[in-house]
């Protein structure tokens, strides 16, 4: 990582440190902003924002967290449907359909279609 810092990198990312001690050593050795990649079930310790800052890390990403949550939600929803035959009394939170469409930007897609598709 130091070679990249010396070459002018703005942020340094060291792949998968496996202990707090290793992360602390990286923080002591490299005088550039450090990026931690936090993956539940990965090699890097799961640390809080404060713990990361104390070790010298200024940035953290959590790239898999939402995917893991989505997987658990999908499994829960379909297990409920399989068991009950319905989504009634589902414990898993769901978006309202229109709110989900807006979240996904479908309103912009539909406006684009309306403006540009032929009326023929």
Predicted regions span which residues?
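Short acidic, glycine/proline-enriched helix-loop-strand junctions
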Residues: 30-36, 79-96
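Alpha/beta enzyme core
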Residues: 1-79, 106-120
